[in-house]
Amino acid sequence: MVALSTLSGLSALPFLFSLVQNVYGVSLEVSTEKGNSSSPILYGFMFEDINHSGDGGIYGQLLRNNGLQGSKPGLTAWAAVGDATIAVDAQNPLTEAIPHSLKLDVKQGASGAVGFTNEGYWGVPVDGSEFLNTFWIKGNFSGDITVRLVGNNTGTEYGSTKISQSSNSSNFTKVLAKIPTKKAPDGAVLYELTVDGASVGGSSLNFGLFELFPQTYKSRSNGLKPQVAQPLADMKGSFLRFPGGNNLEGASEARRWKWNETIGPVENRPGRQGDWSYYNTDGLGLDEYFYWCEDMGLTPVLGVWAGFALESGGNTPITGDALKPYIDDVLNELEYVLGDASTKYGSLRASYGRKEPWKLTMVEIGNEDMLGGGCESYVERFTAFYDAIHAAYPDLTIIASTDQSSCLPSKLPEGAWVDYHNYNTADNLVKQFSQFDNKDRSVPYFIGEYSCQQDNAWPFMQGSVAEAVYMIGIERNSDVVKMAAYAPLLQLVNSTQWTPNLIAFTQNPSTVIETTSYYVQQMFSVNRGDTIHNVTSDSAFGPVYWVASSADDKYYVKLANYGADTQEITVTISGKTGGKLTVLADSDPKAFNSDTQTLVTPSESDVKATNGKFTFTLPAWSVGVLAAH
């Protein structure tokens, strides 16, 4: 279906041209004989904290620079209110992990409200749920603390609470408050904390580690932001690869993602300098990733650090005996995840509230070790990690971070997988349609990252159709391609390090941008069979591509029209009488959805078959899914 909003922006000539497009036809007959089994976990997610996809994104905590973490945090996002000043204070650390606090100095003779604001991650999304606010206070104080969520430009109050509190100058006291809210029309909202200036004039107070959460996805403590989590849940993916990606590797050994610094109370998590320009709080840590998987029914794919930092940073790659402490660290991590409560690290997990071990079946060793000087040493490093992990956990599927044979042992251990990444232009993705047709079936593939990349800020129609063509090729070979994930996954529009991305968002609580590629991924993931069927056709592949599958008594035929002409499609499936047709299309191959426009969305229609024959139109530049019953 061509979106009307797209047509309204076209000149008369292209519009008339679209009315006289050539119409071609393709006839397909789907065999009811079962073919290859299709991977049950084919479609899923790759996540790392890039584009503020974690902090400021799917992680529910809404205040930026909330713990003043890092060696020189500064006052980013903070501002003083009233007759007071604020400063970063290293003399009054909250904990060893949170070495700074926010010092509020109130002027002698102050009056009225004094305190500070936090602007969040380019705004605070107030969605109308009950918010939970925690912070720590130190200093001689007894009185009321007022917390408000207030329009930055309008002064409109979207939530407030008053807390009667006392504290002393010897220790930090934790404060917890619930804030009823009403939904804000945009993200231009500030968090504001004030006290009565007259009662504290000429004195100072210290505040530490602020947290502000809306009602989280599945009501998890320290959980996910529903605004961002729900579109992912709607995709019905099957796996989550975490924590990266480049953000696993770090710029050096010291700056790698350290699992043991992402667990337990958040006041004991120091965070780290992330690999995409900003500091990571690590509030979204190891356990939170597993809760995410549990709440969305996702198979976890845990990436572990493998002795190599980005571009051979620091003293990496690490080889030989020097690698042993890092192998031991991974074994400790796996005991934390999989060990029962009687083990050292399993008991630590239990002490943090999770008695039962997590469900983990897949571990990936490193990330893109074919790049940046990692290839030559990866044979040794992969083998060392593989041998240790496999000896301790023989049932785990272990994935190499590359498929390049020059970086891998001459013979991979039986059961090991390889990870292949493919960022490419639209035309090249289409050319790779048959890439896996003749692959060795003894080595399973994980396509850990792929998308159309050609200097496009947003996924666009031609690129998304090309991705669909590539995905059809993957699904036809889903006996050997076990998993595939579009990347990157998420993007805060205000702070972007990589484009395009699958889902974008702002801090307007109503704004989530579901891109053309998002809809393709959703259409393919939701309509999934467990068996691939042979299809006979009167046409060769191109510009129309197809794959057929089934689950129980339902058949799915996925199609892509990578061209400017309309295609009349006939699909015959013996015994089927009806179904649902979902089509994503736009006659403009450059059409895209963004934070300022939504031009392309799928259309759904009921279709009937005559003697098992379905007939329908596949417009120019389109992706279609027929779910037949």
UniProtKB/Swiss-Prot annotation:
One of its GO terms (cellular component) is extracellular region. InterPro entries: Alpha-L-AF_C, ASD1_cat, Glyco_hydro_b, Glycoside_hydrolase_SF, Glycosyl_Hydrolase_51. Glycans are attached at residues 36, 51, 140, 152, 168, 171, 260, 494, 534. It is an enzyme of class 3 (hydrolase). Belongs to the glycosyl hydrolase 51 family. It is found in: Secreted. Keywords: Carbohydrate metabolism, Glycoprotein, Glycosidase, Hydrolase, Polysaccharide degradation, Secreted, Signal. GO terms for molecular function: alpha-L-arabinofuranosidase activity. Pfam families: Alpha-L-AF_C, ASD1_dom. This is Probable alpha-L-arabinofuranosidase A. Disulfide bonds: none annotated. One of its GO terms (biological process) is L-arabinose metabolic process. Alpha-L-arabinofuranosidase involved in the degradation of arabinoxylan, a major component of plant hemicellulose. Acts only on small linear 1,5-alpha-linked L-arabinofuranosyl oligosaccharides. Residues 1-25 form the signal peptide. Its EC number is 3.2.1.55. It catalyses: Hydrolysis of terminal non-reducing alpha-L-arabinofuranoside residues in alpha-L-arabinosides. Pathway: Glycan metabolism; L-arabinan degradation. The lineage of its organism: Eukaryota, Fungi, Dikarya, Ascomycota, Pezizomycotina.
